[in-house]
Regions:
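Residue(s) in the substrate-gating loop at a strand-loop-helix junction
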Residues: 149
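Alpha-helical segment proximal to the catalytic Tyr-Lys
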Residues: 134, 178-182, 239
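Active-site helix of classical SDR
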Residues: 129, 165, 173
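Substrate-binding pocket helix/loop in short-chain dehydrogenase/reductase
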Residues: 99-106, 110-115, 211
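A conserved structural motif in NAD(P)-dependent oxidoreductases
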Residues: 215-226, 237
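Canonical Rossmann dinucleotide-binding motif of NAD(H)/NADP(H)-dependent dehydrogenases/reductases
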Residues: 3-35
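Short C-terminal tail/terminal secondary-structure segment
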Residues: 154, 197, 214, 231, ...
């Protein structure tokens, strides 16, 4: 039986590990040909090897999502390889403690840390949207999912730069959804809670008990659980869904 992304072409940024890798693999299992992008082609190659070994089709692309020329090249290489882009998962990003010295109150944050966070987590999404949408307009439609966070819906202490960036992703998602709804382009975002990935492991493990106390399911999420939501939003089964923030967080946001 054909998968829900059968014959579609997907572009996944931040595809070397974590949620990005899990989603690229899930898309391939559902029949998509996948362009896996990460900072270097070598980083992306591991995910591509897993897809190809399972009988799927994928290519590796290297590039920095903070650089417009790199993003334009990612889109161009995907189209050159597969002819189109039906769905895109703009997932490249960093955790709150990955830029600068770690958890800091707002008055302690340097401008450099703030700017670096927004460059990766917000400007990167903007640039991907810009170039993906331009191509999708020419081909007559498509579906895009951006990685936001529960931090895009609430405030979190000592993470103001991360929270600002993720709120920005939610805002970009809603605005783009409205602008392009009549062009056949759907734009949504996924808002994960605490998920076990290489990016979050160091940040969360230092305060695991405190984090779990806020999650009604009392566990971390798995990248595959986020991937399933993203795949569905990219598929035609979500044809009436745009501008949405899909929370996948074990109940954190509801508590």
């Amino acid at each position: 039986m054909a998968g829900i992304l059968d014959r579609k072409v997907a572009l996944v940024t931040g595809g070397a590990s974590g949620i990005g890798r899990a989603t690229a693999l899930a898309m391939a299992r559902e029949g998509a040909r996948v362009a896996v992008a990460d900072r270097t082609e070598e980083n992306a190659a591991g995910t591509v090897a897993l897809i190809n070994a399972a009988g799927g089709q994928a290519i590796a692309i290297g590039g920095d999502v903070t650089m417009e020329a790199d993003v334009a090249a990612m889109v161009a290489r995907t189209v050159a390889a597969y002819g189109r882009i039906d769905c895109a998962f703009n997932n490249a990003g960093v955790a709150g403690g990955s830029v600068g010295p770690g958890r800091q109150r707002l008055h302690e944050l340097s401008q450099a840390s703030f700017d670096a966070m927004l460059a990766i987590n917000l400007r990167g999404v903007f640039l991907c949207l810009k170039h993906e949408i331009a191509h999708m307009l020419a081909q007559g439609g498509g579906a895009i999912v951006n990685t936001a966070s529960i931090a895009g819906l609430i405030g979190l202490a000592t993470s103001s730069h991360y929270v600002a960036a993720k709120h920005g992703v939610v805002g970009l998602t809603k605005s783009a959804a409205i602008e392009y709804a009549q062009d056949g382009i759907r734009v949504n975002c996924v808002n994960p809670g605490y998920v076990t990935t290489p990016m979050t492991e160091e940040v969360v493990q230092t305060r695991l008990d405190a984090v779990m106390a806020k999650v009604p399911m009392n566990r971390m999420g798995h990248p595959d659980e986020i991937a399933e939501a993203v795949v569905w939003m990219c598929s035609d089964k979500a044809s009436f869904m745009t501008g949405a923030s899909q929370v996948v967080d074990g109940g954190y946001y509801a508590a």
